[in-house]
From Swiss-Prot:
Residues engaged in binding ATP: 13-21, 40, 121
GO MF, one example: argininosuccinate synthase activity
Compartments where found: Cytoplasm
Domain of life: Bacteria
Enzyme class: ligase
The protein's name in its UniProt record: Argininosuccinate synthase
Signal peptide (UniProt feature, chain positions): none
Major localization listed first in the record, in broad terms: cytoplasm
Catalytic activity as recorded in UniProt: L-citrulline + L-aspartate + ATP = 2-(N(omega)-L-arginino)succinate + AMP + diphosphate + H(+)
Length: 405
């Protein structure tokens, strides 16, 4: 076990579930530390008042439960979507992007309450331990961090349940055995991993999907919506302006009802292993398609292509936990500069798991009818100019061909 004997007061990222309740009691009994709890409402869809009651029952005096949904979407999700960030070609980073926000609040509460440490419930095998801790150290280089899953002596679920029983921590009857899979959720997405999902050759059971109906069960009639953008951020649906969190929640409803946003993938974790996950990102999938569509008529080709080159690196930084790094902030500044004229409206058709762009318009559009028309362009484009353009671009190819023949 790492030495935490000098820790007096700890801020714990607390869900109210069995695992973090055991961690709470472990911090009290094994370290003798005073515990402050922080529970974030990230739009996970759970009632959070039970977390307060359970913390009170376990003797906690300082309890923080905060609604961070608007901050989450405005300051973390939307900046990420300006970049069109996708990890390994498919993953929209729903879990990754929530961790720096949680760490930020843990550090803020530690400063406010005079705590000298923070604690989290991430295991020693996953990415989240890295994300939580890199973010925390970036915000407070002197903070102590306790990760009980790396420190304690419990070897099995039975050990945890025995500890819970010994310390009178309530255990729901359906928690006596291990859950069939692990779940993480927020307003952007839900992820399911482990247990029944560990064999990547087997299809995930339908009951794993909690955010969307199956595409096969989706309506036979398509849903058509319009998403409005300003400076790269979605601001309206069908002409109705909404706050960031409200807008994403509405897109989630459209995605859910049309079976959109399911993903079954094997990803490369930062710690080195491969992991199979089943993710649902209904609103985010719609948002990404809409954002790329509005960029297609408002971004210059050079800027658009450079963004696409930078995106995998930007996505990696978020996945690995470097949200608060200078390189991510540098990339963000460039991305945000590119979004100054990304405004307008995109029309999308949602149908049985598919998001189809069927229209896009903008007062800042670079699309020119005169240039692309198949009819008389009235001198807007002289096709004779193409001959010289091609000849100059072919110069090196012709030189190579002449040498090699």
């Amino acid at each position: 076990m790492a030495s935490h004997k000098d820790v007096k007061k700890v801020v714990l990222a607390y869900s109210g579930g069995l695992d973090t309740s055991i961690i709470l009691k472990w911090l009290q009994t094994e370290l003798g530390a005073e515990v402050v709890t922080f529970t974030a409402d990230l739009g996970q869809g759970e009632e959070l008042e039970p977390a307060r009651k359970k913390a009170e029952m376990l003797g906690i005096k300082e309890i923080y439960i905060e609604d961070v949904r608007e901050e989450f979407v405005r300051d973390f999700v939307f900046p990420m979507f300006r970049a069109n960030a996708v990890y390994e070609g498919v993953y929209l980073l729903g879990t990754s992007i929530a961790r720096p926000l949680i760490s930020k609040h843990l550090i803020d509460i530690a400063r406010k309450t005079g705590a000298d440490a923070i604690a989290h419930g991430a295991t020693g095998k996953g990415n989240d331990q890295v994300r939580f801790e890199l973010s925390a150290y970036a915000l407070n280089p002197d903070i102590k961090i306790i990760a009980p899953w790396r420190d304690w002596s419990f070897k099995s679920r039975t050990d945890l349940l025995e500890f819970a029983e010994k310390h009178q921590i309530p255990v729901a009857k359906d928690k006596k055995g291990e859950a069939p899979f692990s779940v993480d959720a927020n307003l952007l997405h839900s992820s399911s991993e482990g247990k029944v999902l560990e064999d990547p050759a087997r299809e995930a059971p339908e009951y794993v999907h909690m955010r969307t109906i199956s595409p096969e069960a989706a309506p036979d009639k398509a849903t058509v919506i319009k998403v409005g953008f300003e400076r790269g951020d979605a601001v309206s649906i069908d002409g109705v302006r909404m706050s960031p969190a409200t807008l994403l929640a509405k897109l989630n409803e459209y995605g859910r009802d049309n079976g959109i946003g399911r993903l079954d993938l094997v990803e490369n974790r930062f710690v080195g292993m491969k992991s199979r996950g089943v993710y649902e990102t209904p609103g985010g999938t719609i948002l990404l398609a809409a954002h790329r569509a509005i960029e297609s008529i408002t971004l210059d080709r050079g800027a658009a292509h450079l963004k696409d080159e930078l995106m995998p690196r930007y996505a990696e930084l978020i996945y690995y936990g470097f949200w608060f790094s200078p390189e991510r902030e540098m990339l963000q500044a460039a991305i945000d500069r590119s979004q100054e004229h990304v405004e307008g409206e995109v029309t999308l058709k949602l149908y049985k798991g598919n998001v189809m762009v069927i229209g896009r318009e903008s007062g800042k559009s670079l699309y020119s009818d005169k240039l692309v028309t198949f009819e008389d362009d009235q001198g807007a484009y002289d096709q004779k100019d193409a001959a010289g353009f091609i000849k100059l671009n072919a110069l090196r190819l012709r030189t190579l061909a002449a040498r090699n023949r």
